[in-house]
Amino acid sequence: MASSNLIKQLQERGLVAQVTDEEALAERLAQGPIALYCGFDPTADSLHLGHLVPLLCLKRFQQAGHKPVALVGGATGLIGDPSFKAAERKLNTEETVQEWVDKIRKQVAPFLDFDCGENSAIAANNYDWFGNMNVLTFLRDIGKHFSVNQMINKEAVKQRLNREDEGMSITEFSYNLQQGYDWTCLNTHYYVELQIGGSDQRWNITSEIDLTRRLHQNHVLGLTVPLITKADGTKFGKTEGGAVWLDPKKTSPYKFYQFWINTADADVYRFLKFFTFMSIEEINALEEEDKNSGKAPRAQYVLAEQVTRLVHGEEGLQAAKRITECLFSGSLSALSEADFEQLAQDGVPMVEMEKGADLMQALVDSELQPSRGQARKTIASNAITINGEKQSDPEYFFKEEDRLFGRFTLLRRGKKNYCLICWK
């Protein structure tokens, strides 16, 4: 992605919500490489899909020759961003936040190149400059540059202040001051001139721009990416089970892959622009191919493959595809013990059972059948498989060979209803 027309290319992909001064940014990028940053607060022990667009934007800028700084908010994470939140965040302990900081830094690392010469990425932590700052320094050197009148008129704050049941504490109110000082420090140490953030961060970004200009007289700029929504208006990045996480221990690669496979036709080509590095021409050609093929669209599989590889690597992608194929075909011979562990984590419904159980009880306990009577009829109708093998004996008791790796048995009713038994 060439630096000279980078903003135009981002706009073509729908990745630009606002730029604080588009003309100035275009001029600055035309002059040569720029240092830019994006902040990630440790509000959980993993990033989720909502973080992926700004994180990939950092990568896009680095590919164009610019220097990305990934800032993990070890200090701001102790406070919590109140922007557009209906209630105050729970305060976590320093030990918990530090643990989350370490995990998030490790998650960010594979997306950026930290050893590529002058535009090598930098990982920073704002606890480094806030950790030993006393309250007098904070109020005198930072607080005096912020207007309370302006802050309470920000839409993100007004929404909370106008609620009768929920106000805003001084702790949360100070978040904007903290974030403002982040950019001042990054501008001083790394000459950062551009911040990337979600469109819900616009008011924080403009405050940071004002503070940096006042303290350093430096012209800095902000670019926000859109908050992703689906074509039907519902929130992106959520499933019935909650958020889709980047940590494979919280959302398995299989579940992650399936999330993208299930993308609606109305969203898939837009998401290819947001979440992959395919060119616009390649995406348009794929869309045209899908329209004219007369078959099921290929785009969802391309999207799932590209994003799963980005987040979980080739090994994670191949495991996800292997599990998908085995569940579709009914043949489990290619699955490893680790694959079954993914299924147990979040791939299919799971039930724990004691050894010695019979098939009818397993169907009831797994909720594949409502009663033993109904289970008996379903088994007799040849609609149940155990590890891919048909079983029509209602009196069947599980055998040792049914316990794959000594731990797992996969039941299926019909073609699509699965449950994994994990033996105690």
From Swiss-Prot:
Superkingdom of this protein's organism: Bacteria
Subcellular location: Cytoplasm
Pfam families: SYY_C-terminal, tRNA-synt_1b
GO molecular function, one term: tyrosine-tRNA ligase activity
Residues where ATP binds: 238
UniProt short sequence motif 'HIGH' region, positions renumbered to this chain: 42-51
Catalysed transformations (reactions): tRNA(Tyr) + L-tyrosine + ATP = L-tyrosyl-tRNA(Tyr) + AMP + diphosphate + H(+)
Record-annotated S4 RNA-binding domain positions: 357-414
Enzyme's top EC category: ligase
Motif range ('KMSKS' region): 235-239
GO biological process: tyrosyl-tRNA aminoacylation
Keyword Ligase in annotation: yes
A GO CC term assigned to this protein in UniProt: cytosol
Major site of localization recorded for this protein: cytoplasm
Keywords per UniProt: Acetylation, Aminoacyl-tRNA synthetase, ATP-binding, Cytoplasm, Ligase, Nucleotide-binding, Protein biosynthesis, RNA-binding
Protein residues bound to L-tyrosine: 37, 175, 179
EC numbers on record: 6.1.1.1
Record-listed N6-acetyllysine modification sites: 144
Subunit structure: Homodimer.
Task of the protein: Catalyzes the attachment of tyrosine to tRNA(Tyr) in a two-step reaction: tyrosine is first activated by ATP to form Tyr-AMP and then transferred to the acceptor end of tRNA(Tyr).
Family classification: Belongs to the class-I aminoacyl-tRNA synthetase family. TyrS type 1 subfamily.
The protein's name in its UniProt record: Tyrosine--tRNA ligase
Source organism of the structure: Shigella boydii serotype 4 (strain Sb227)
